[in-house]
Amino acid sequence: MKHFLSNLDLHSETPQDYESIIFGAGCFWGVEKKFWQLDGVWLTSVGYSGGELEDPSYEIVCSGTTDHVEVVKVIFNPEVISLADLLKVFWECHDPTQGMRQGNDIGSQYRSVIFLNSELHKNESLSSLETYQDELELNGYGPITTEISMMKNYFLAEEYHQQYLAKNPNGYCGLGGTGCSFPNN
């Protein structure tokens, strides 16, 4: 399976000196578009993560019975874009206080998550959550419900979903943030 825009193989290994992270912030179509446009992002793909079932389908994930989340895997060059920059995009692109939904998209598969493969990334992600929580509270929002944990699996979604908004520019995207900017250090 190839990336619709870059033509890279979606099964590619992460290049040496590059890093990866998985974000869930609602429907994966809009979330992926937020990240594929960034300088320093080498490859994006959409998939399912967090549940126990091996290689689930979209239909079974949407049933809410597998505990999987619709996610975007982001492989990036940390010499060009930092994890802090990616986290800023993540926090600002959705409302992390909504629990098991994002806007009109309702269900556990739309919950806010960050899945990591590095303790260093985990610490930076947790710190960014605290920073953004303070900003949200100043603007009347409740607690962030984002799950931050080590990645246990990642299954590519069906080709139809990969880079969906590049293939379907007028396709549905219910992604919407809080309007609160991530504070600059």
PLM feature segments, named:
Residues M1-N185:
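Flexible coil/turn and secondary-structure edge motifs
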